[in-house]
Structures are given as structure tokens and as C-alpha cells.
């Protein structure tokens, strides 16, 4: 079967090594956008349940995809830890997981820095407890069950922090034991597993390409994305975009279950959530790759944006002067792109304004077949409120640092 050429393939190996952690962080920030609208419409308790269902309904699926893509399938704690390092739920440094391996079945991790905690602490103890207890208990196990259904992730200590500056932010044990009951899959998982996103075929990694073709070697303290081959980085970037789409499909199911048949309410929440992350993602991509603040730079950001990727899932014809979006598997899933059209263009406006507030997107065509051009104007656009909400997260302005990548041996 022919596979579509990735839009990330045109980037250099160095650019991809910069972009991949950005994409992982963007995936984490999806919730900073989405959960704000869930709190305002459904309240805090329902927001917690939405978050649990959202992650539990997607992370086992995308974790398995990444294991296969990078050839590190297994059943032990090392496999669990490798998966977390390539998971939008645990972007590097912003969620600074430090791992200890005692043996194949026993390990620990602690967070030297938890960006999500620092985002939530100002909101009060109820929100901290909700995230670090109510959400994490089922979702850590759900992520681990992709590797081994008899894996239990349990807290050593976790927030609310006492004292208030306690460090590390939290610590957990990860134990696999045959005597443990199997962790159950949530019912939503079956629906998300039937999606076109989950079954998207991406080009295999070329083992002859210079650099690492997989993550079958030792577990590393920090993944050095620069050590991977160009081919592997293209695949990782596409997989991370699919992680986002699977998470959002699961989020949509959870929102729909609470909208009680109110299609307008459901669509409004989904749309606002997309606008927020669209703008924040665009700004990070533009800055990370040092793209120009003109129409050309804006079109490049659109082309590389998770909204439009991977190419095998979202069909876009790229021209020097415009992008032409066509019907694709993403439309069948009701993915992000299905929320955008000539009469619903705010996600595109958020993207181009993040590149330069004097730019506007001009969109023409039908709901599922449209063209976007970028034009210069004389008036700076005011930042959209949905983007402002997403920027509440420290992740929106996070700066990555260079780190040494060291193999972790059994203690």
C-alpha cells in the first residue's frame, strides 16, 4: 500500500529534533484549552471525569502505536517508562519525570518539575487534589496497561504539597506483579480504537538512515531527539500528532456524553478548545523553528501545525501561495479539521495572528473542500480570548534546555 509523504519530511534532522519536544508539549496544552470550557459549562466535578475518560480512552492506543513504531514493545517497567518519555501526557522537562529501575518489574519515578501542578496550584487545593489524585489514579494505570495490564502505579507522596515548596513535586512506584488484578479498559477505548486516526498507516522508518532508527536500546534519563535519524524523527512527529487526534476524539466523546443531546453546546466547547490550542501551538512552532513573521512564515506554520497533520490523515495540498484542504479520513472521525471551514475560520485566524497579528487568513470553498490564503492588513488583531485562556498555562511560554542523555541502569 502507498503511504503518503509526511509534511515533516521536508524539515532537516536538526529542525525535527527541535520540533518533536514542541509537539509533545503542545499535546499536553490541549487540556489547558479544553478543560477551561468544561469547567465553565459543566463544573469542576464533571471536568475531572471528562479528563479521566479523555486520557483513559486514548493513551493505551497511542502508547501501543509508538511502541510498535520505535520497536520497543515489551511487558516490563522499562517499556512503561520509554512510553511516558514519548507521550503528550508527559512532555519532556515541562513534566520532568526522573526514572529509577530496580528490576524489570519494579521501578519508581518522581517529578523534579511538574508544569501541570504549577498551573493548577494557584486555583486552590480542590483543583490540585482533583488532578493529582482523582485524575492521576486511573490515568497512570490506563497508560501502563498498554504495556502490562498487571501494572500498578501508586503514590509515594503527591500534592497538595506539604510543606508548600516540597520537592520533588511527587513520587510514584511502578510495580508489575502476577498477583495483581488486571486493569480494565474504559468503554470509550473501543470507540476510539475504531477511528481512522488509530488505523492510520505511516511510512516505516528507514533503518539505513543515519542515526537511531528506534528506541530498542537502554532506557535513557532524557531522550536525545537529535540522536534519532531523520526518518525516525519524521515518524515520531507524525505519531505525536496522531496522539493529539486520538486524545481529542476521546475528549469529544466525553463532552458529548455531558451535552445531553445539545449539539450546539458540544460543538461550541470543541470549537473554543481548538481555537485556544491552535494559537498557542502556532506561536511555539514559529518560534522554535525561527520562521518568518510574514505570509510565507504563516503558511509554513499552517503546513506544520498538528491541525493539518499527519499528511496520511489530513489531506492538504501545499502551494507557495495557499493551502488547499480536501476531504480526508480526519473528516470521517470528526477530528479538528472538521470544525474549520470558510464560515468557522477562527482556528486559522488564531494560527496566523500568532505568527503576526497583522496577518489574516482568507478562506474560501465548502465545508470539506477549502483554500486558505494569508494576507497582510493594516490593523493588528486582538488576541482571541480562547488563546488567552490557553496561555494561562506556563507551558505556553516554556523554554526547553539542552540536556545530556544518559543510559539508566538497574539500581
Could you describe each region identified by the protein language model?
Residues 1-108, 115-135, 141, 145, ...:
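N-terminal accessory segment detector
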Amino acid at each position: 500500500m502507498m503511504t503518503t509523504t509526511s509534511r515533516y519530511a521536508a524539515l532537516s534532522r536538526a529542525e525535527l529534533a527541535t520540533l518533536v519536544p514542541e509537539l509533545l508539549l503542545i499535546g499536553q496544552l490541549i487540556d489547558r484549552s479544553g478543560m477551561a470550557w468544561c469547567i465553565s459549562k459543566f463544573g469542576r466535578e464533571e471536568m475531572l471525569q471528562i479528563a479521566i475518560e479523555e486520557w483513559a480512552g486514548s493513551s493505551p492506543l497511542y502508547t501501543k502505536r509508538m511502541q510498535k513504531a520505535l520497536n520497543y514493545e515489551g511487558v516490563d517497567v522499562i517499556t512503561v517508562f520509554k512510553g511516558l518519555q514519548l507521550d503528550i501526557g508527559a512532555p519532556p522537562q515541562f513534566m520532568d519525570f526522573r526514572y529509577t529501575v530496580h528490576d524489570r518489574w519494579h521501578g519508581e519515578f518522581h517529578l523534579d518539575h511538574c508544569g501541570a501542578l504549577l498551573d493548577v496550584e494557584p486555583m486552590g487545593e480542590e483543583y490540585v487534589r482533583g488532578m493529582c489524585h482523582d485524575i492521576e489514579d486511573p490515568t497512570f494505570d490506563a497508560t501502563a496497561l498498554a504495556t502490562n495490564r498487571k501494572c500498578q502505579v501508586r503514590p509515594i507522596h503527591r500534592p497538595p504539597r506539604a510543606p508548600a515548596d516540597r520537592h520533588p513535586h511527587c513520587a510514584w512506584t511502578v510495580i508489575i506483579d502476577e498477583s495483581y488484578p488486571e486493569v480494565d479498559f474504559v468503554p470509550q477505548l473501543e470507540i476510539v480504537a475504531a477511528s481512522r486516526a488509530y488505523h492510520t498507516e505511516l511510512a516505516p522508518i528507514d533503518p539505513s538512515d543515519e542515526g537511531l532508527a528506534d528506541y530498542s536500546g537502554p532506557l535513557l534519563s532524557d531522550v536525545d531527539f537529535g540522536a534519532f535519524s531523520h526518518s525516525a524523527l519524521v515518524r515520531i512527529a507524525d505519531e505525536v500528532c496522531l496522539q493529539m487526534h486520538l486524545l481529542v476524539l476521546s475528549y469529544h466523546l466525553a463532552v458529548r456524553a455531558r451535552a445531553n443531546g445539545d449539539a450546539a453546546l458540544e460543538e461550541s466547547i470543541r470549537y473554543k478548545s481548538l481555537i485556544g490550542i491552535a494559537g498557542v501551538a502556532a506561536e511555539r512552532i514559529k518560534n522554535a523553528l525561527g520562521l518568518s513573521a510574514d505570509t510565507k512564515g504563516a503558511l509554513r506554520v499552517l503546513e506544520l501545525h498538528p491541525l493539518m497533520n499527519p499528511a496520511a490523515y489530513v489531506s492538504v495540498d501545499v502551494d507557495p501561495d495557499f493551502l488547499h484542504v480536501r476531504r480526508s479520513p480526519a473528516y470521517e472521525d470528526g477530528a479538528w479539521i472538521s470544525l474549520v471551514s470558510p464560515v468557522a475560520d477562527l482556528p486559522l485566524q488564531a494560527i496566523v495572528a500568532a505568527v503576526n497579528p497583522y496577518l489574516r487568513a482568507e478562506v474560501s470553498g465548502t465545508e470539506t473542500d477549502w483554500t486558505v490564503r494569508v494576507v497582510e492588513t493594516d490593523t493588528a488583531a486582538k488576541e482571541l480570548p480562547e488563546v488567552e485562556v490557553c496561555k494561562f498555562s506556563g507551558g505556553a511560554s516554556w523554554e526547553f534546555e539542552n540536556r545530556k542523555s544518559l543510559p539508566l541502569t538497574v539500581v
